[in-house]
């Protein structure tokens, strides 16, 4: 009988051990992390704006990387690309590609065309030009004001890249530096602009002055790919209507005070101020993120007013 008891105890011990081992195994299986979801593959269709076959680009995180990908598809140097428009091959300043691309957007790359030199007499302080840049070192004309000095020079067009001012090469300059240079030109003197037109299909497109542009919906869907100068690109929701309206107003202030338009810069300024409690905090945030611009105080207060209005909507 004692032997039988010992055998029974031994049997129970094995069974218990087996059960405990099984419980540990199940727990270990349950605790294993689930495999990561496969990365979302984002592919965009692209053409050269003056005409080409359709190519495909993917795996880019910045404007520079995108230009390099497009250049690789069409076997041209990246430096040939002036800028890109979304969903239209026309030189439409309201459709410029910036830091955000709708996931269904079609990318048209505008490349260098005819180079020209134009002499302009600065009879007034304001030339009537609004400057922007492509994020990769090329500044170009985004708007020409009606009845302005530049408007009277019919060979200067919206979309023209400004390569040099009075022989000084400005490739690599940001738009605000170019606008400042033009503003500082002496009144009652002649100056020379070296310009490069975007290549056109048959050199038949009419001159455009580019009316008031709107930030509008960037993509055709509800998500966009946001490009960054540092770090990976991210997929984000399309901004709300109230946010888009506020960003458009900030862009208007950039044009009024600095002679530039830049939706990406306006967006950065809005993001810097949306969680700040007063204009002093906002000014500090701008200095930390955009200190190179040296914005005038009155401009900062006006932008703060726009952000404050957006918070109340």
Swiss-Prot record:
Biological process (GO), any one: regulation of neurotransmitter secretion
CC per GO annotation: basolateral plasma membrane; cell-cell junction; cytoplasm; plasma membrane
Subcellular location: Cytoplasm
Domain of life of the source: Eukaryota
Keywords attached to this entry: Cytoplasm
Pfam families assigned: GIPC1_GH1, GIPC1_GH2, PDZ
Domain PDZ: 117-197
PANTHER family: PDZ DOMAIN-CONTAINING PROTEIN GIPC2, RGS-GAIP INTERACTING PROTEIN GIPC
Protein name: PDZ domain-containing protein GIPC2
Species for this entry: Bos taurus (Bovine)
């Amino acid at each position: 009988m004692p032997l039988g008891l010992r055998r029974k105890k031994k049997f129970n011990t094995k069974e218990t051990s087996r059960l405990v081992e099984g419980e540990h195994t199940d727990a270990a299986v349950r605790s294993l992390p689930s495999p990561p979801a496969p990365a979302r593959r984002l592919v965009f269709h692209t053409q050269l704006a003056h005409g080409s076959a359709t190519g495909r680009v993917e795996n880019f995180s910045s404007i520079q990387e995108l230009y390099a990908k497009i250049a690789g598809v069409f076997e041209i140097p990246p430096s040939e690309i002036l800028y890109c428009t979304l969903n239209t091959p026309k030189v439409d300043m309201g459709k410029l590609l910036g830091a955000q691309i709708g996931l269904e957007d079609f990318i048209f790359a505008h490349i260098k065309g005819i180079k020209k030199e134009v002499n302009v007499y600065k009879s007034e302080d304001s030339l009537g030009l609004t400057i922007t840049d492509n994020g990769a070192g090329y500044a170009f004309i985004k708007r020409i004001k009606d009845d302005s000095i530049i408007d009277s020079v019919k060979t200067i067009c919206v979309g023209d890249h400004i390569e040099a001012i009075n022989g000084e090469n400005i490739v690599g300059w940001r738009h605000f530096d170019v606008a400042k240079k033009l503003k500082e030109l002496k009144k009652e003197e002649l100056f020379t602009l070296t310009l490069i037109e975007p290549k056109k299909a048959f050199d038949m497109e009419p001159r455009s002055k580019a009316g008031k542009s709107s930030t509008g919906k960037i993509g055709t869907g509800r998500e966009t790919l946001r490009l960054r100068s540092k770090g990976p690109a991210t997929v984000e929701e399309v901004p709300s209507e109230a946010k888009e309206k506020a960003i458009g107003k900030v862009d208007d202030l950039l044009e009024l005070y600095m002679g530039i338009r830049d939706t990406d810069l306006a967006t950065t300024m809005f993001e810097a101020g949306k969680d700040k409690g007063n204009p002093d905090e906002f000014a500090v945030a701008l200095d930390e993120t955009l200190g190179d611009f040296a914005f005038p105080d009155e401009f900062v207060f006006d932008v703060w007013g726009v952000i404050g209005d957006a918070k109340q909507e």
